């Protein structure tokens, strides 16, 4: 049985990107073809030459909300609030960071004005009701702070409001960016269109749970967090058309893979709107995509396990070793890979 430790690798701290490059598509791109072909060191801007006319790139069009708030308990202790998802106009599921857990009925006095009351708790998540001057989503857009990942050791600035967002983001609701999409700028998208590559979109609202570690030794015991997603009829038809013409379906990011796999019914992609808790790790056969663009993921993370299921665990760990040796930049603001699937029987 696979263990969490089977997905460990050593990463020097200085390779964790603390901010974006000046140009989105200037990030490096490691080409990881199916074995035994060698890895190639490229750039994201090389994608038009690496893809083929008729290929379909599938993006996640979720938009990150400024979901981080600060306040204090009535007793005076500081509280950090991270919105996970909205429930109506004035309620939200949140994560709280505070010295002591809050209980149902407790109030939080918000630094930006107004207050929030604790209505309930489920594990790491709290249900809060907000007494603020406008609907919560609108109010957050004015006063909220962008929630950068915990491995970025600085406060967010105005530049992050632009760069920790894809250029095609439109469906408001994520608290973390679908980071593979951050590499695509308008110039690159135009060159891909000119190459004959088509674009399709799903929506998956990335939750704060994406940063939660696997806390069990055996993978089969892990329970994934739930995230809302939508695969529309238009995208389903685009996928069918791409397959019919011999094009490849290429996921831009693990969120796209999780959405497409969650919408598979009897071996066919179907329109779907709802929640997914799908946990993809080696042993699972990914059938919805032919290739994947993805960033480099944390050791022992569920995202690393997903890409290992697609490309092979040994192959991925070898690629990560190569990335460390070649000084690639890691995680959300880091570099990317173009992955192709493992061969049958490859571990």
Curated annotation (Swiss-Prot):
The keyword Cytoplasm applies. It comes from Xylella fastidiosa (strain 9a5c). Keywords: Cytoplasm, Queuosine biosynthesis, S-adenosyl-L-methionine, Transferase. Belongs to the QueA family. It catalyses: 7-aminomethyl-7-carbaguanosine(34) in tRNA + S-adenosyl-L-methionine = epoxyqueuosine(34) in tRNA + adenine + L-methionine + 2 H(+). Gene3D superfamilies: QueA-like. The gene is queA. Pfam families: Queuosine_synth. Transfers and isomerizes the ribose moiety from AdoMet to the 7-aminomethyl group of 7-deazaguanine (preQ1-tRNA) to give epoxyqueuosine (oQ-tRNA). One of its GO terms (biological process) is tRNA wobble guanine modification. This is S-adenosylmethionine:tRNA ribosyltransferase-isomerase. Its EC number is 2.4.99.17. Pathway: tRNA modification; tRNA-queuosine biosynthesis. GO terms for cellular component: cytoplasm.
């Amino acid at each position: 049985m696979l263990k969490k430790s089977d997905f460990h690798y050593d990463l020097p701290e200085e390779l964790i990107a603390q901010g974006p490059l000046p140009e989105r598509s200037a990030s490096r791109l490691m080409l990881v073809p199916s074995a035994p072909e060698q890895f190639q060191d490229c750039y994201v801007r090389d994608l038009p030459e690496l893809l083929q006319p008729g290929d379909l790139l599938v993006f996640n069009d979720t938009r990150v909300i400024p979901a981080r708030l600060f306040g204090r308990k009535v007793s005076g202790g500081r509280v950090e609030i991270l919105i996970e998802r909205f429930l109506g106009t004035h309620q939200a599921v949140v994560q709280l960071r505070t010295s002591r857990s809050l209980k149902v009925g407790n109030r939080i006095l918000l630094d930006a004005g107004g207050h929030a009351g604790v209505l309930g708790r489920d594990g790491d998540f709290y249900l809060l009701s907000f007494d603020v001057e406008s609907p919560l989503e609108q109010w957050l857009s004015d006063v909220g702070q962008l929630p950068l990942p915990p491995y970025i050791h600085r406060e967010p600035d105005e530049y992050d409001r632009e760069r920790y967002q894809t250029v095609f983001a439109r469906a408001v609701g994520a608290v973390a960016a679908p980071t593979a999409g951050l590499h695509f700028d308008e110039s690159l998208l135009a060159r891909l269109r000119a190459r004959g590559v088509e674009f399709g979109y799903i929506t998956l609202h990335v939750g704060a749970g994406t940063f939660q570690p696997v806390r069990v030794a055996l993978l089969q015991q892990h329970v994934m967090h739930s995230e809302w997603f939508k695969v529309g009829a238009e995208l389903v038809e685009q996928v069918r058309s791409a397959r019919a013409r011999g094009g490849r379906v290429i996921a831009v990011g693990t969120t796209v893979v999780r959405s497409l796999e969650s919408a598979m019914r009897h071996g066919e992609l179907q329109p779907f709107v709802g929640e997914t808790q799908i946990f993809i790790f080696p042993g699972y056969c990914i059938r919805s995509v032919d290739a994947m663009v993805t960033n480099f993921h944390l050791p022992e993370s569920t995202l690393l396990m997903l890409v290992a299921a697609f490309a092979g665990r040994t192959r991925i760990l070898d690629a990560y070793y190569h990335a460390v040796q070649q000084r690639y930049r890691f995680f959300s603001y880091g570099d990317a890979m173009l992955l192709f699937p493992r061969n049958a029987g490859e571990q």
